[in-house]
Structure formats: C-alpha cells, structure tokens
From Swiss-Prot:
Consequence recorded when altering S344T: In strain: RKS2985, RKS2993, RKS2995, RKS3013, RKS3014, RKS3015 and RKS3057
Location(s) in or outside the cell: Cell inner membrane
Entry keyword set: Cell inner membrane, Cell membrane, Membrane, Protein transport, Transmembrane, Transmembrane helix, Transport, Virulence
Transmembrane portions of the chain: 17-37, 39-59, 61-81, 110-130, 197-217, 235-255, 274-294, 295-315
Membrane-protein topology: Multi-pass membrane protein
Gene Ontology biological process terms, A to Z: protein secretion
The protein's name: Invasion protein InvA
GO terms for cellular component: plasma membrane
Record bears the keyword Transport: yes
Length: 685
C-alpha cells in the first residue's frame, strides 16, 4: 500500500500539493490529536529547511520560479498549524511533545529569560529580515518592469541584425516575461511573510492571556501553575512557528538579493568575492591580532582568527603570484606555445583547442629605437582618443610592436594582422602641408619624400616656425602620423567596425533617444545601419552626431531601399557638418566637374538587381583620368583644402574612380553645400 502511494506520488507529484492544501483547509476546522500535531510540526520544520537549502543552492532566480507559490502554501500551513496548537493549548493544556520540549528548553529555570529570547527571535524576523526582503522585492519589481521595454527592443534588434535566430529570440522573450512575472509576484508574496509574522505575535498573546484564564476557570489551576504551564506552552508554540517562518524569510531574502548573471550558488559567490583580495586578508589579520592585545580581550581567540586569515592570505598570494608568472597576451589570453623543429618551418601549437580564432585588430610596427619614445608619448591612447573626437568611433586596442628591419622613420599599420600601409614620418622634422616653390626662396631646403603619387615636404622646427609666421600650415611628426593613420583607418573601417560595434553604439543611443531608435529599427536592420556608418566613415565623415544620422535614417530608410542612395540622402542631411569639416573658414574652395564630364559618367552607370556600378570602356576611363589629373595636380599642391564639386547622382562614382590617384581629395555634391557657406570655384574640369 505504502509503495503504491509513493509510486503514485512519483508519477504525479502535484497530488502531494493537492493533498497538503486539503489538509491545511481541514486543519482550520477539525480538531487534531497531539500525535498528529507533532507530525505536522515536524513536517513544517522539514519543509522550511528544504526551502532554505533550495534557495541557497539555486544558480539563477528562475531556477526557483515557484517560490511565491511556495511562500503562500507554507504560510497557510503555519497559520493552520498555529490554530490547531492554540486549540489544544486552550482546551487540553497540552499541545504535544515538540511544543513542550521547545518551551522547557528555552525557558529553563526563568520565565523572564524565555520571554526575552523569544522576543529577540520575533523582532529579528519581523523588523530586520522581513522588512528588508520586502523593500528589496519592491525595488527589484519596479526596476524589472521599467527595464522590460528596453530589453524587448534589444531582443528585436538582435533578431533583425541576424545575431540570433527566431528560436533564440522566442526563448529570450520567454525568459524575460517569466522574470518580470516573478519579480512582480515577489512584491506581493513578501506580504505573506510580513502578515505571518504579525499573526504569530497576535496568536502568542491570545494563547498566553486566554490560556491563563482558561486554566484558572476551567482546569482549576491556581495563578502560579497556570502562569508556569501556559507560559511554557505559549513560548514553545511561538518558537515552533517562528523558527520555520524565520528560515522561509531568510530564503526569500536569499532569492530577492541574488544578482542575475552569477553562475555559481550563493555560498560559493560570497566566499569567492569576500576572500578574493589577498591585501584585504592580510590587513584584516593584522587588525585582528591588534584587537587581541587590548586589555581584557581574550588574546588566544584573536590569535586563532588571525592565523586562519594569514593562512588564507598565503594561499591566495601564492595563487596570484602563480597566475602573474604565466605570460599573457594583451587580451589576457595564454600565448601560443610554438616550437619550431630543426629543418622545418612548421610550428607546433600547444593546447590547440584553447587557442582563440580572433586576430589582433590594430597593430603598429615601429622602429625599435622609437618604440620607447612613442609609448611615453602615449601614441596608441592619443590615436584612439583623437579618432573618436574626429570620427565618433572607438577604435579597438592599438598594439605597438617592434618592426624588424624598419628604418628610424617608418611606421607600418597592420589591420587584423595584415599589412595595410607603410608611412614615412621624420620624427625630428615638421611637415609643410601647403608647400609651394616659394619656400625655397626663403633659403629653406626641405627634405622631400615621395609616397605613391604624392610628395611630402619636411623642414626643421626652426624653419617651420619661420614658415608658420608667413602663413604656411605645418604639422609636427606625431600630428602627421595621426593624420596618415586616421585617413587609412577611416578608409578601411569595415575591417574593424561592423554589426557588433554598431549594436553597441545603438545601445548607448537608446538610453537617451529610445523612441527615435525604435522608429529607425522598424525600417532598417542593424546590418543596414552598420553599412551606412561604414560608408560615411570611409569618406571621412564623422558619425559622432548619431542623433542626426538616426533622424535622417528614420526619414529616408522607409523610402530608399538602396544603401548607396540612402547614404547620399544622409550626407545631404549632414551638409552643415560636412562643409564645416572641409571648408576653409566660411569659404569652400572647389573644382567643379563640368556637365560634359558628368554626362560621360552617367552613360557608364550600370544598374543590376543587386547594385549600381560604373562601367566605362578602358580608353574613355583613361582619357577621363588624364584630364582630371592634368587639371588637379598643380592645384592640389597650391591648395590643400580643395574639394571636387559635382551632382549628387554621380558623386560616389567619381569618388570611386579618383580615390586611387587622389586619396585625400574629397568629392562633394551640390546637395551637401550648406546655406551658410560660400563656394569659390577655382577651376572647372
């Protein structure tokens, strides 16, 4: 029979809860014998211990999502049990062995001591634990519900960007909904504990006052006997109810104060974080032994505690020293263990399964003789800071490495460990940006460096100051190096700036402009936004004003499906900022593309279902480039701030065609000219 019942309970565990609820309701009405009350009291204590241990060892809050319902059931069970014990105390002056034992154990030989101990337990539960847990639950529920729309938008954005699939999005939404419901339930469930504590206090006074009255009138006891008997039973009954209630209250405190994201159980997290810092341990050990030397303090006790802390410090210090001794890469990963065998160029990688497949985004190879000076000058930090100011993008960590075989004036840029560009920078000289042949007439013989089709002129610092007074623009070596690196990094932005980085920028924007971002994401995926930003950056247009870009996207993304045309519309919206970047004061010096040249470009534009591209025959393309080169070469030497001005429909094609020969020449459309800027057309091609 017993085995059959246990098997039924195993197959349908919900029957146990159903039986328990029926029993609880019956206890409110039906008188129970003392032996059954003892069993139910023991069951109450066991359930409280079970809930306590379960809450302590959960790895996340949703692992115990039924806790609010458990609170309701255990609270009802304790109240029903208190009613049954009160009935026995008042009618029979006997509530079973457990209550009598608890009362005798706590009271001992003194009623006053018993009352004080019981009062302390009640105060601790009601004022400290219950009130604190209730407040934490209220705040957690409020923040969880307030943050739900933002989390929902984040899931939708990840789904649109292709970072997660539909199943993963569905699972995340389910978890988010369950968390919100759980925190909302906690806010109300904590009232069960508070109400239970108040009811327990009232029941104690009823048992004490009513018991003495019933004992003297019904059982014929004198005042002394009634006081002794009913005090013992009242305190015993109160403790039997309050101790399980205290365990449940502590369990609730454990759960509501747990931080989501901690992977281990609470005990492990507490010990790991409390004893993680060796410095804290050794200082605490010293303070502990110092306290033991105070007059009247038991020195052996403090010595033992100090020794325990010192032992913990020793193990933690040894562990930290061992970890520090292991060489690490810049990202904190273990370096590859590569052994080259004699006669073979093949390398052997130790523990291949733990090797990251990531490449290093940005590396600068610098001359060995210059590396220390460049590190002192904080080249990497300055590059990242200034690039963010100029372009609005946070560069990945920039690593400086010794460049084998580099001369003292060469710098090599690697993007994702692939060589992109080599720059020549004379660190002891200054570069003349707007050089002209007039410089020679001042008795200055510049150092000339030819890089590609461009010439760079360098002079000494004394000569540079003289030229600056005459109106020439000069850059020191670090500024010139930054300029060269920034142009190359902007041109290759798609190598290190993509969907994930775009998502990070959008998350920051969401905190200030959630409605704007929501409107943009209705019509543009994160991938599409990422491509727009890449195209802007590749032409040296800053994306720091993300609000303006998002406003333009919200306006044009529903109408324009082609990303290239969409970028042109956004550039038009950013006209004031683009003109400010490339204009000389209030004037924009420009070389205008003639209508004849634009017509040649238009005739070569080909459109497919996937993209639009320029397809000129080789002869026409060569003739056009020769014409542009002839017109621009001399002008660009005399005017470094020139831009090429053309119609919006051919702008991007002209830019693509000339960027190999004139990488620093900006091509603007008429729609990108701000009203506040005047245009000085120097020449027409």
């Amino acid at each position: 029979m017993l085995l059959s019942l246990l098997n039924s309970a195993r197959l349908r565990p919900e029957l146990l809860i159903l039986v328990l609820m029926v029993m609880i309701i019956s206890m409110f009405v039906i008188p129970l014998p003392t032996y059954l009350v003892d069993f139910l009291i023991a069951l109450n204590i066991v359930l409280a211990i079970l809930v306590f241990m379960g809450s302590f060892y959960i790895d996340r809050i949703l692992s115990f999502s039924t806790f609010p319902a458990v609170l309701l059931i255990t609270t009802l069970f304790r109240l029903a049990l208190s009613i049954s014990t009160s009935r026995l105390i008042l009618i029979e002056a006997d509530a079973g062995e457990i209550i009598a034992t608890f009362g005798q154990f706590v009271i001992g030989d003194s009623l006053a001591v018993g009352f004080v101990v019981f009062s302390i337990v009640t105060v601790v539960q009601f004022i400290v634990i219950t009130k604190g847990s209730e407040r934490v639950a209220e705040v957690a529920a409020r923040f969880s519900l307030d943050g739900m729309p933002g989390k929902q938008m984040s899931i939708d954005a990840d789904l649109k960007a292709g970072i997660i699939d539909a199943d993963a999005a569905r699972e995340r939404r389910s978890v988010l909904e369950r968390e919100s419901q759980l925190y909302g339930s906690f806010d109300g469930a904590m009232k069960f504990i508070k109400g239970d504590a108040i009811a327990g206090i009232i029941i104690i006074f009823v048992n004490f006052i009513g018991g003495i009255s019933v004992g003297m009138t019904r059982h014929g006891m004198d005042l002394s006997s009634a006081l002794s008997t009913y005090t013992m039973l009242t305190i015993g009954d109160g403790l039997v109810a309050q101790i399980p209630a205290l365990l449940i209250a502590i369990s609730a405190g454990f759960i509501v104060t747990r931080v989501n994201g901690d992977s281990d159980n609470m005990g492990r997290n507490i010990m790991t974080q409390l004893l993680n810092n060796p410095f804290v341990l050794v200082v605490t050990a010293i303070l502990t032994i110092s306290m033991g030397t105070l007059p009247g303090f038991p020195l052996p006790v403090f010595v033992i505690l100090s020794v325990v802390l010192s032992v913990l410090f020793y193990f933690k210090f040894r562990e930290a020293k061992r970890s520090a001794a292991k060489p690490k890469t810049s990202k904190g990963e273990q370096p590859l263990s590569i052994e080259e065998k004699e006669g073979s160029s093949l390398g052997l990688i130790g523990d291949l399964d733990k090797v990251s497949t990531e490449t290093v985004p940005l590396i600068l190879l610098v001359p060995k003789s210059r590396r220390e000076d460049l590190e002192k000058a904080q080249l990497a930090e300055r590059l990242r800071s200034q690039f963010f100011i100029d372009y609005g993008v946070r560069l990945p960590e920039v690593l400086l490495r010794d460049g084998e075989g580099l001369d003292d004036n060469s710098i090599v840029l690697l993007i994702n460990e692939i060589r992109v560009e080599q720059f020549t920078v004379y660190f002891d000289l200054m570069r003349v940006v707007n050089y002209s042949d007039e410089v020679v007439s001042f008795g200055i013989n510049p150092t000339i460096h030819q890089q590609g089709s461009s010439q760079y002129f360098w002079v000494t610092h004394e000569e540079g100051e003289k030229l600056r007074e005459l109106g020439y623009v000069l850059r020191n070596a670090l500024d010139e190096l930054y300029h060269c690196l920034a142009v190359t990094l902007a041109r290759n932005v798609n190598e290190y700036f993509g969907i994930q980085e775009t998502k990070h920028m959008l998350d920051q924007l969401e905190a200030k402009f959630p409605d704007l971002l929501k409107e943009v994401l209705r019509h543009a995926t994160v991938q599409r936004i990422s491509e727009v930003l890449q195209r802007l950056l590749s032409e040296r247009v800053s994306v720091r004003n993300m609000k303006l870009i998002m406003e333009a996207l919200a306006l044009w993304a529903p109408r324009e499906k082609d990303v290239i045309n969409l970028v042109e519309h956004i550039r038009g919206a950013m006209a004031r900022y683009i003109c400010h970047k490339f204009a000389n004061g209030g004037e924009l010096r420009a070389v205008m593309v003639s209508a004849e040249v634009e017509d040649v470009i238009r005739k070569g534009i080909r459109q497919t279902s996937g993209s639009t591209f320029l397809s000129l025959d080789p002869e026409a393309s060569a003739n056009l480039m020769d014409l542009i080169t002839l017109k621009l070469d001399d002008l660009l030497i005399a005017h470094k701030d020139l831009v090429l001005l053309t119609s919006v429909d051919v702008r991007r094609f002209i830019k693509k065609m000339i960027e190999g020969r004139f990488p620093d020449l900006e091509v603007l459309s008429f729609g990108e000219i701000a009203d506040s800027k005047s245009v000085n057309v120097i020449k027409t091609i």
